[in-house]
Amino acid sequence: MAVNLYDYANQLEQALRDSDEYKAIKDAFAKVKENEESKKLFDEFRETQMSFQQKQMQGEEIPEEDLQKAQEQAQAIEKDENISELMNAEQKMSQVFQEINQIIVKPLDEIYAD
């Protein structure tokens, strides 16, 4: 019987949805959305990040004034408890993803280790 990796991937997706880390992100994001100021700061910061990524992908330089604006936004975000909670939750989930990725690529690592 052949192993269907996609079935395992779907099980992993469900396990991630059931995890405490996922629930923490979901709860923290709900708090951000409920608070008008937090939501505005969060949306502006994400918009700035996407703009930077787009410019970098196109090989454009990011103007100094845009960098300054992003730094000011980052400082405001650090002071916002709701967004800080969300960022901490995202960081924990990112750690989980890194650990899962190490497990997933382990068979390939073993092949190339010799």
Swiss-Prot record:
InterPro entries: Com_YlbF (IPR010368), YheA/YmcA-like_dom_sf (IPR023378). It comes from the Bacteria. NCBIfam families: PRK13676.1-5. Belongs to the UPF0342 family. This is UPF0342 protein SERP1381. It comes from Staphylococcus epidermidis (strain ATCC 35984 / DSM 28319 / BCRC 17069 / CCUG 31568 / BM 3577 / RP62A).
